[in-house]
Amino acid sequence: MAEVDFGDTELFEQLDGDLPASSVHVRFDSEGEANDVQELVSQHEETINRLSAENQELKRRLSLLNRPSGLPVEDKLDGPLLQILFMNHIISKQYHQEIEEFITSLFQKYEEHRKSNSEKTSFNIKPQPSSILLEENDDSDADTMKNIKQAFSVVGSVQYFKNFCLDKLGQPLLNENPQLTEGWDIPKYQQVFTQIVSLDGQEIQVKAKRPKPCCFNCGSEEHQMRDCPKPRDQAHINMKRKEFLDACGEAGNQNQQRYHAEEVEERFGKYKPGVISEELQEALGIMDKNLPPFIYRMRELGYPPGWLKEAELENSGLSLYDGKERLDASDGEIEDRDTEAKKHVSYDVSKLVNYPGFNISAPPDMFDEWQMFGSIPMQQAHQKDIFANYLTDSFPPGSSNKSNKRSSCQSSSSERKRQKTSGNHTVTSAVMDMDMESDEDMYHSRASKGYMFHPPLPPGSPSYGTPPPLPRGTPPSTPPNFIPPPPPTPTPPPLPKGTPPPTPNRDSPKVPPQVLDEDTWTLEELEEKQRLLWAQLDNGESTNSDCDAHTPITVSSVTSSPSRTELDIATGRKAAPRQTAHELKSPCVITKLFVAEPEEGGPLIPEEGGPLIPEEGGPLIPEEGGPLIPEEGGPLIPEEDSETNEDSNECYVVEGNDIEVNKLSSKHENASEKNPSDEDATEEAACVEPSPKRSGVPDVSKFAEGITPFEYDNMSDSTGVYLRLRGLLKNSPRNVQKSKKQV
């Protein structure tokens, strides 16, 4: 074996500088070994020469594709558009200039398109994985290398022949979407098999697919039956429709599954409340000696309401009805409509869950880190036995809340009766709201200072700020600003028969009627007032229906004013009295008086040939020779004489506070004589002949002299609708028949 010398001796010899350097590295001991080595060296030299020639050829070819050195590129659009390798072909040689001009026209076309559509987004062309990067090994920064890679990536290499083309790299995708790229149409092939081939001895259950909708006439899936161009075959359509419905039913039955409570319990049976498993400890990242983080939060929020719902006792849910009342099947007691919504709730304390560290004591080796979590220590009120006693005492199984509900209803109803509508109820409600707000503020202030135990309330329970209901029999509370109503005005006793009424003096001051506010009336007074008004209406209807044709009218007025002492005075209108021609020769005074309601006695019925004198409690009408004495509060008619024409047929109608003069001409006399049927349509009144000592009725200008007008702003102006309606009712066939029967 030849001894190999690494040249270390020559190195040291050169360092010493004494001996000349020799270039002998390999030494051969025998001639045979030298010949073999020389043959190997010659072979390697041939291989090296061949590889060197190939390397030179590759460098020459690469120089055609490689990017020019030192060319700066700022963007990928600054790179080359394409690189053409012109082959030795007659077409490439002949149309070399046309190809270059076409490429130049493409540049111009792109620039024009970009200027016209500046807002349009350009395609994001990414090089495909098969692309080749034309790059030289140079020292450039990262941004420059990124632009070079994008600009000098060969994304396509196609060799075009006369009859075909050969694509070596494939076409890139536009925006990574094959639909936007030409040449990426994937052909659809027919399905060769329909079922999966199973192994030997195995059965594969293939799920039935839902049939696709198709035309029942021809079986095509491209159109519906109504658009089928072929003639309809009804028998074939019915058969295909039946097959489609059967297939849909089979596919639907496979998906129908029922879930039962037992299956759910078996599925989640390993999860138990209050028990921390090893998997949960690992998921929470806690050790065996650490309390779960939710325990500290439960100390602030209380017992979980979901598990409290699980401990709630359920009743049968059946209700018995007897037509009037409902019987609860749980306890057999009668339940009102008001208490139907509020059902009785009770709890089974044996179903309360044990939570170590919350309602039961934690093991002694566990750490209570409530300060680290910003919580509170374990509360004594959260103990399981204390909470169970609270549920048992507050929600016993056989108790009911009907008494509290009824007492609260009674107190609320009585309070509504006593409250005023003028504003006291607003004060009362405001005071109650202030009380409730103060209670809530106290609750929040206490909770902020220190933690207080508030056990969760069952559904339907009142909030903390709601005041408790009053016990049964408690009188309603009086509002603070309540003003008691004044006592009712006593009614003066009726005057005996023959007693002349007091004549008011013209100089005496007039006492205005006392007007009370309707807001001071209580509910009992309003009901009494309503009852009296209905009685007056019934009296008035019966009086109007029973009156004779020659009987003066007595109307019961219905008070529309809020005052209890006011009388509703109807406005007068012109009336044609029912008289003979002889009686109309002298002037007469027709007086129409309206009273509130005669307390004693009936309607005014005059005697034959006598004056109109009412019974007790009615208005007074003067006799012959006496002055006109009005009702109390009515107008004063002076006794002064006035110059009147005795031969003229004049009739003065006096109605309440209004005085009208009706001049009845001879035409009216003829009309009253010729048309007796029209007499019923007029107002019935009595004409009283004046005293022979008097020359006539005073002039119109002197009427209402010295009378204080009664003004009431809230009283609406009279339109006469009531009188017209009453006239229509009196002319009805029913009233006409009654009047004929009475005559």
UniProtKB/Swiss-Prot annotation:
- Classification via SUPFAM superfamilies: Retrovirus zinc finger-like domains
Q: Which UniProt keywords apply?
A: Coiled coil, Metal-binding, Nucleus, Zinc, Zinc-finger
Chief localization class? nucleus
**Biased composition regions of type Acidic residues, renumbered to the chain:** 638-649
Q: Where is this region: Disordered?
A: 390-432, 449-518, 540-566, 600-649, 662-700
Q: Where is the composition biased (Low complexity)?
A: 399-413, 551-564, 601-637
SMART domains, A to Z: PSP (SM00581), ZnF_C2HC (SM00343)
Zn finger limits (CCHC-type): 213-230
An example GO BP is: mRNA 3'-end processing
Q: Name one Pfam family in it.
A: zf-CCHC
Coiled-coil boundaries: 29-67
What would be one Gene Ontology cellular-component term for the protein?
nucleoplasm
GO molecular function annotations of the record: RNA binding; zinc ion binding
The subcellular localization recorded is: Nucleus, Nucleoplasm
Q: Where is the composition biased (Pro residues)?
A: 455-504
Listed Basic and acidic residues bias regions: 666-677
What family is this protein classified in? Belongs to the ZCCHC8 family.
Q: What does this protein do?
A: Scaffolding subunit of the trimeric nuclear exosome targeting (NEXT) complex that is involved in the surveillance and turnover of aberrant transcripts and non-coding RNAs. NEXT functions as an RNA exosome cofactor that directs a subset of non-coding short-lived RNAs for exosomal degradation. May be involved in pre-mRNA splicing. It is required for 3'-end maturation of telomerase RNA component (TERC), TERC 3'-end targeting to the nuclear RNA exosome, and for telomerase function.
Name-wise, this protein is Zinc finger CCHC domain-containing protein 8
Q: Which gene encodes it?
A: zcchc8
